[in-house]
Curated annotation (Swiss-Prot):
Catalytic activity annotation: pseudouridine(1915) in 23S rRNA + S-adenosyl-L-methionine = N(3)-methylpseudouridine(1915) in 23S rRNA + S-adenosyl-L-homocysteine + H(+)
Main function: Specifically methylates the pseudouridine at position 1915 (m3Psi1915) in 23S rRNA.
HAMAP family per record: 23SrRNA_methyltr_H
Similarity remark: Belongs to the RNA methyltransferase RlmH family.
Keyword line: Cytoplasm, Methyltransferase, rRNA processing, S-adenosyl-L-methionine, Transferase
Species this protein is from: Nitrosomonas eutropha (strain DSM 101675 / C91 / Nm57)
Complexes and interactors: Homodimer.
CDD domains for the chain: RlmH-like
Name of the protein described by the UniProt record: Ribosomal RNA large subunit methyltransferase H
């Protein structure tokens, strides 16, 4: 199973890149994590709806075929790390890759939210989209470690 992360935004600060890389490199090949940065739309003279629509089209192009789509959204379902581990086991058993979608500064277009198989919330608080990458990568690693009885998770 591959874990794809499509994240709107590029030119992230080094601490974001390092944080994401720290956890993505810990993942074994059987649950490889791959980040694809989606270029954000330029704001000049455009309304939010236009920006989100343009980013939505880029996301659709980048979506791996046949994947299970999980949108990260503050209004999504709250899940504990143990629940995320259960979900990962289910996804792995389904034989499909999983794609997590993180919106940019303005969020995600409703069309992307509608094609999602699931909506999850990392927090009910609004998070900077760069930080969401790091938090997601850490939680995926932690959830995977639970499925393998690895001592990283000690709850």
């Amino acid at each position: 199973m591959k874990l794809h992360i499509l994240a709107v935004g590029n030119k992230m600060p080094d601490w974001i890149k390092k944080g994401y890389t720290e956890y993505s490199q810990r993942m074994p090949k059987e649950a490889e994590m791959q980040l694809v940065e989606i270029k954000p739309e330029k704001r000049i003279g455009k309304k939010t709806e236009q920006l989100l629509q343009a980013e939505s089209e880029r996301i659709r192009i980048a979506l791996p075929p046949g994947c299970h789509i999980v949108v990260l959204d503050e209004s999504g379902k709250q899940a504990t790390t143990v629940r995320l581990a259960e979900l990962m086991t289910n996804w792995r058993e389904s034989g499909r890759d999983v794609t997590f979608i993180i919106g940019g500064a303005d969020g995600l277009h409703r069309d992307i939210k509608q094609i999602a198989h699931e909506k999850l919330a990392l927090s009910t608080m609004t998070l900077p989209h760069g930080l969401a990458r790091v938090l997601l990568a850490e939680q995926l690693y932690r959830a995977f470690s639970i499925t393998r009885n690895h001592p990283y998770h000690r709850a």
